Amino acid sequence: MPYWKELLKGDPLPWLLEPDTVQPAIRYFTLRDILGHDNSNSEVKKAQAAIMSSGPVPVMLAAQQPEGYWNKPGPGYGPKYQGTIWSVIFLAQLGADGANPQVHTSCEYVLSHSIANNGGFSANGTPSAVIHCMAGNLGSALIDLGWSGDKRLQAALEWQARTITGEGIADSQNKDSVERYYKSGTTGPLFACSANAGLSCAWGAVKAMLALGKIPLSKRSPRIQSAIQQGTDFLLSRDPAVADYPFGPGSRINSSWFKFGYPIGYVTDVLQNLEVLVALRQAQHTRLTHKVNQCFKAGFEQAKL
């Protein structure tokens, strides 16, 4: 029996593997991420086919325009949770098949319309709207949907890494430089963000690490490795179970860390923080074992978390 099963009150796998026409992705991710089957496995193929024919994914694709966008043409951030950027992010989180023609068209659309002239993913196509939470979400989604070899995506991820480390990026006062921070969006290194009063934003850090952490070790540039290390150190600088990261003026903790839902947008919860840090090989860190144990204690009679 795997070690993690011994910590639960029961075996959740039969429940997780149940066919579910409302949320078919649960079975798919269980087969792939918990049981370790790759995409060539016949059951994994069937599970992903179910995603494409039932649940939310076909509903989303039915609303897509032939050109590849949702709602209106352009960069695609708005309307929030319904625009093109959000649709691509959620398609990936829901396990959509990147080889599907409509999904492929949507990815090409955002890569053609949502990148600023500095190379970063932008909410409105301008450098001042490059922001870590959106850029990380979108980068992660595009990797999941099979675009890791695309030069535009690679450049966007390199730019995100640079904005984390600050390498060669001028401050917001240097308006003659294309490669600079802005008073809006990403305002400085180490995830500084205007939406968080210019402080380092842990939500942005989690999303950035979600994307950069999916780059294979052999493909990571020294800059990306440095950004991942800085992001990991920042997320572990506080107890992830408490989530007392910098949050605007004052010292209160953002309650959204403890409100769970899926798919997940620009907000981050403690479970996604845990997911990212485990993926970055920090599972044995003392601050993570606290949170892991807390999650296991949350299991109830049927071993459902």
Language-model regions: role of each:
Residues 1-305:
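Preference for long, amphipathic alpha-helical scaffolds in soluble/luminal domains
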